[in-house]
Amino acid sequence: MSIQIKQSTMVRPAEETPNKSLWLSKIDMILRTPYSHTGAVLIYKQPDNNEDNIHPSSSMYFDANILIEALSKALVPYYPMAGRLKINGDRYEIDCNAEGALFVEAESSHVLEDFGDFRPNDELHRVMVPTCDYSKGISSFPLLMVQLTRFRCGGVSIGFAQHHHACDGMSHFEFNNSWARIAKGLLPALEPVHDRYLHLRLRNPPQIKYTHSQFEPFVPSLPNELLDGKTNKSQTLFKLSREQINTLKQKLDLSSNTTTRLSTYEVVAGHVWRSVSKARGLSDHEEIKLIMPVDGRSRINNPSLPKGYCGNVVFLAVCTATVGDLSCNPLTDTAGKVQEALKGLDDDYLRSAIDHTESKPDLPVPYMGSPEKTLYPNVLVNSWGRIPYQAMDFGWGSPTFFGISNIFYDGQCFLIPSQNGDGSMTLAINLFSSHLSLFKKYFYDF
């Protein structure tokens, strides 16, 4: 699909901002490699009624000048987003130098319908998300890049490339919410807090009470038929309606030892875990891990993180089972394992995890660092259920679609709630193509 870049602007903060280095925690640094950005896409379909398009300050649908001006103002309180990475000794920092965030304006001769259901893939990412040149070193590229793409049908997309060292998904969308509010002439809803050293530094003395095996180096154990590099991976979307989710929950064995009500995420994540293990054709004795990124904001409470904390507070919950147990035991047991793993991430555990990471001079990037780009035999289920995408109204209405632009790792998936509030959810997943049809069979077999 063709795309034409019309203009690229390095947007700097509208006012003078603190010129300093921002200390990053090890939690900031271990989720992704430093030479990578996370891509996400918002889709806005132009309303049929022109009166629904009218912004109080412009008659143009998604006026780039308004977006750029608002972005410049949003970068004042969120000034680290306009900085660059640098290395200080054995760790990364953000040089808050106000060099700016990249804003790209692009056009495409295609219509939004050409992208179908907007499933993540290389083409969607290439057309809608800004690309980055990492060849000039760690301090050469922006931490935030945004692309406004106009399509022949009148609709637009806003693609984000956000650096994970700068912040996690929740902080990123709090920033986007502030940007959107400023574009409408409103004040930001939150005042960001950037001091990570104050809140996530090593305790004195360290209190490491758990093993924290989730931070150990990960080496995928691929079978021979997947080692030749010729087996393709496929990314696709699977939708679960509210009725299907309710049917899945009705399969739970209420007479089991699970005493606490299981959440929708726990049930669906457990179901995905089982379905992937079956689809891969693993032997019954093999172990498969379910890895779940968890927002620690509500779990850290001694002391609590301040509202508006801008940084990474993502921790990994991990549960392990054999393929035989996943296949033979009821879904209630599997979902119960998920619940137990999530409950284990309390304040005591997370503070111990922080001390563990800060005590290590060098930590690998867990799970997201293998050159084969696979989590095999494991699976990672990330929930985007609490990301406030509907707040991304820049003055021309809320997005009609929100999703990840590209999933790079086999076994990685995202659970995204419906945009229209009908109680459904979509699973975006990357699997080896040879496993995909069986996964679909098991995923809908309930």
Curated annotation (Swiss-Prot):
GO MF assignments: anthranilate N-benzoyltransferase activity
Any Gene Ontology biological process: flavonoid biosynthetic process
Induction (record text): By fungal elicitors. Elicitation triggers a rapid, transient induction, reaching maximal abundances within about 0.5 hours and returning to basal levels within 4 hours.
Source superkingdom: Eukaryota
Enzyme Commission numbers on file: 2.3.1.144
PTM field: N-terminus is blocked.
Keywords from the UniProt entry: Acyltransferase, Flavonoid biosynthesis, Transferase
Reaction(s) catalysed by this chain's protein: anthranilate + benzoyl-CoA = N-benzoylanthranilate + CoA
Top enzyme category: transferase
Pathway: Phytoalexin biosynthesis; methoxydianthramide B biosynthesis
Keyword Transferase attached: yes
A Pfam family matched in the record: Transferase
Active site: H164 (proton acceptor), D393 (proton acceptor)
Function as written in the Swiss-Prot or TrEMBL entry: Catalyzes the formation of N-benzoylanthranilate, in the course of methoxydianthramide B, a phytoalexin. Phytoalexins are produced in response to infection by parasites, and are essential for the expression of disease resistance.
Family: Belongs to the plant acyltransferase family.
Protein name: Anthranilate N-benzoyltransferase protein 2
The species this protein was found in: Dianthus caryophyllus (Carnation)
